[in-house]
Regions:
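C-terminal helical subdomain
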Residues: 194, 261, 279-314, 319-323, ...
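Conserved mid-core segment of classical short-chain dehydrogenase/reductases
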Residues: 123-127, 134-145, 149-153, 160-188, ...
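Canonical Rossmann dinucleotide-binding motif of NAD(H)/NADP(H)-dependent dehydrogenases/reductases
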Residues: 74-110
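A short C-terminal helix-loop "cap" of Rossmann-like NAD(P)-dependent dehydrogenase/epimerase domains
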Residues: 127-128, 274-289, 338-346
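Conserved glycine-rich Rossmann-like NAD(P)H-binding loop of the short-chain dehydrogenase/reductase
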Residues: 106-122
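Hydrophobic structural elements of the Rossmann-like NAD(P)H-binding subdomain
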Residues: 84, 162, 216, 259-262, ...
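Short C-terminal tail/terminal secondary-structure segment
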Residues: 315-347
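Catalytic loop of short-chain dehydrogenase/reductase
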Residues: 86-93, 166-254, 263-269, 292, ...
Length: 347
């Protein structure tokens, strides 16, 4: 049966969560108008004035979609509390995960290094989501203790945690893999992987994560395949995935806590911008993946399901969110792009 309108009442009732700064009266009027977006088949029946209003609403709707503000919520995290590590700015996947978690009914605490909080936009996100911001260096156990203690003061035990932390000085300095600076390599490991172990160890000792809770860390397929330019970050991601399995067994056995990693498509982020050839890799992955690249919004949605009770028996897994890229060998689009490039080189 065809729909008369593009959005139903139930689909727009979730919008107030995304617009807490707008007065209730204006917001209710906006939601009412949004319900009047017609299905395409009804467009010819609309009057001229109504069409003008609809046109404005389509522009607003496009803006919301572009900003990742959805008109659908399932309350998957209603009543749940969480900690998001690693949000820096709107380019961060962790930023979008934080927004989606709140849209789905959760209360959260945001954390990043003091420098990142000062130089980035985390305080703005905290204000928008009504979330406390706790500066902390995830490589230091005492500062991690402060984060979890603050969360427990605010919420009691937390239900979910996101680890979205990664940085390689060798990549930033343009060092080749066969010419690494080993002090910088250790820094890569400490920030990108060992911080995950420290986070889990501190949480377990404090008994900070509730029974049946969920921990997710973000990773990349370079942990298992060779990608030129990803450098020592590939080694760090391999370690990260191993920690998820090893700690997943212990935390699951003792406390029923789930630990998984999400292997995300190449995504434009502040951290990823330092990887040589990133834009070409994005194009290649888009051509190779049958569903195309998964973007930050897709990753956030996947993380939400892993935080929810719907995935209560999933743990110690490395889960690909990449449009099918990880299972592909070659696609017609990739072959065509390669052939075109070769033909251009031979001219």
């Amino acid at each position: 049966m065809s729909r008369k309108y593009l959005y139903s009442r139930s689909e727009v009732e979730v919008l107030p969560r995304a617009f807490s700064g707008i007065s209730g009266g204006i917001l209710r009027y906006f939601c009412l108008l949004l319900q009047l977006l017609p299905a395409e088949s009804n467009w010819q029946k609309m009057g001229a004035l109504h069409k003008k209003r609809i046109f404005v609403l389509y522009i607003i709707n496009g803006y919301l979609t572009d900003k990742g503000i959805t008109t659908m919520s399932y309350n998957l995290l209603a009543g749940k509390k969480g900690i998001i590590f690693g949000a820096l700015n709107e380019q961060s996947i962790a930023w979008r995960v934080a927004e989606r978690a709140v849209e789905e009914g959760a209360e959260i605490i945001l954390t990043n290094t003091a420098v990142a909080v000062r130089m980035g936009q985390l305080n703005e996100l905290g204000q928008k989501l009504n979330a406390k911001v706790v500066p902390a260096d995830a490589t230091k156990e005492d500062e991690l203790e402060v984060v979890f203690q603050e969360a427990m003061k605010s919420f009691g035990k937390v239900d979910f945690v996101l680890h979205s932390i990664g940085m390689s000085p060798n990549v930033r300095k343009g060092r080749a893999y066969d010419d690494l600076d080993y002090k910088m390599l250790q820094t890569t490991f400490d920030i990108s992987a060992v911080s995950f172990h420290k986070m889990l160890q501190v949480a377990k000792k404090l008994d900070a994560i509730a029974e049946g809770g969920s921990v997710v860390a973000l990773t990349y397929i370079a942990a298992q395949r060779t990608f030129v330019g990803y450098n020592d970050m590939a080694d760090a991601k391999s370690l990260l995935e191993s920690i998820a399995r090893s700690f997943g067994y212990i935390y699951g056995r003792d406390k029923g806590v789930r630990i998984n990693t999400v292997s995300q498509s190449p995504t434009v982020t502040t951290a990823g911008s330092g990887v040589k050839g990133m834009s070409d890799l994005l194009d290649f992955a888009e051509d190779l993946s049958p569903l195309g690249n998964a973007d930050a919004n897709d990753c956030a949605d996947y993380c939400i399901t892993l935080f929810s009770d719907l995935t209560r028996k999933i743990t110690m897994q490395n889960l690909f969110n990449d449009g099918g890229f990880s299972s592909m060998g070659m696609s017609a689009a990739a072959i065509e792009a390669f052939a075109t490039g070769r033909a251009n080189r031979e001219k």
